[in-house]
A protein has these predicted regions:
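Short stretches within intrinsically disordered, low-complexity N-terminal or propeptide regions
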Residues: 29, 61, 271, 311-312, ...
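ABC family nucleotide-binding domain
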Residues: 7-206, 212-221
Length: 340
């Protein structure tokens, strides 16, 4: 007899109503369902059906008008902002249509970043991030920044970042919306394979019925209500890339500068720099706590603030090094906690 799977998400008569003047709009209207551990669940619907609003409610991004949502047995509607933010950090991961990578950081640093908030040491988090980037076929692009990567590559970094801290649940909102058809299938393969590897739950919003072939459960949403729920015991499985992308410049074979001796030249695009500047753990943690105290914090939804904080710390560290060389260390700004 097959063992019954553990329920990790339970939605009970969820309702979300918006007001536009005197008019009430029922974005989510009395929805109830469960999602089990390790399940790949798709919320399928057309634009305006309420599927993204439902995802935001499940993730605690928006508040219910009525009803209740339990994540891992805990009612998220009863949590205050700080407890909810901490709960999301500990249990949830996010993949977005717009990638939401931090532009001033490399692929490796973007994947490492969620681990900072778990107070994981530099060496361990670096190792975890490298492993995740290799899983998604980007071991050769760890030092590339978002602007140096294609949309598909950026989304793979986003997937690696979402899964690196091993969250119980990953929410994905139209993760292939900005990708071409070939890259879409590659990303879906990786998303499903990553979830299966550690028995993680994925809830994905999509308008594309073709993508639901990867789903174990399909919840069809229409006008804020559940039209039907389909179970697919033989859903399409995913796979990790069978190759590792390498920048074109690395593919050129070069003769050793001194035959007979090991060539010491290293391509900086493919190697992890030992001296990569990464925000000090305690400093960036204080930035997070300061943000939490002003109304709640979520890693992916606060990327602009985090980018500003991270870039400021990076700039000040560089400035401090320059000042030391010039004997001007006393003139370095001390207001690193003031992030707007």
């Amino acid at each position: 007899m097959e063992e019954k799977k553990k329920t990790v998400i339970e939605v009970r008569d969820a309702k979300k109503v918006y007001r536009m003047g005197q008019e009430k709009i029922k974005a989510v209207d009395g929805v109830s369902f469960t999602v089990e551990e390790g399940e790949f669940c798709c919320l399928l619907g057309t634009s305006g059906s309420g599927k993204s609003t439902l995802l935001n409610l499940m993730a605690g991004i928006e508040k219910l008008t009525k009803g209740e949502i339990l994540i891992k047995g805990k009612s998220i509607g009863k949590m205050n902002e700080n407890k909810l933010a901490k709960f999301r950090q500990d249990n949830l991961g996010f993949v977005f249509q717009s990638y939401n990578l931090i532009g001033s950081m490399t692929a490796l640093e973007n994947v490492e970043f969620p681990l900072v908030f778990k107070r994981i040491g530099t060496g361990k988090r670096r190792k975890m991030a490298i492993e995740m980037l290799k899983n998604v076929g980007l071991g050769g692009r760890m030092q590339h920044k978002p602007k140096e990567m294609s949309g598909g590559q950026q989304q793979r970094v986003g997937i690696a970042r979402a899964f690196v801290a091993r969250p119980a649940i990953v929410f994905a909102d139209e993760p292939t919306g900005n990708l071409d058809s070939k890259t879409t299938l590659e990303v879906m393969d990786m998303l499903k394979a990553m979830a299966r590897k550690n028995n993680q739950t994925v809830v994905m919003v999509t308008h594309d019925k073709k993508l639901t072939e990867y789903a174990d459960k399909i919840i069809n949403i229409l006008d804020g209500k559940i039209e039907s729920i389909e179970i697919q015991p033989n859903s399409k499985e995913g796979k990790f890339p069978e190759y590792e992308e390498t920048p074109a410049e690395e593919k050129k074979t070069e003769k050793p500068s001194n035959p007979g001796k090991k060539d010491k030249k290293k391509d900086k695009a493919s190697k992890v720099k030992k001296d990569t500047v990464f925000p000090n753990l305690e400093d960036i943690q204080s930035e997070v706590e300061a943000t939490q105290n002003t109304g709640g914090f979520d890693l992916q939804y606060e990327t602009e603030k985090l980018e500003a904080a991270a870039q400021k710390l990076i700039d000040e560290e560089k400035a401090a090094k320059m000042a030391e060389q010039d004997g001007l260390s006393e003139m370095i700004s001390e207001d690193t906690n003031n992030v707007s």
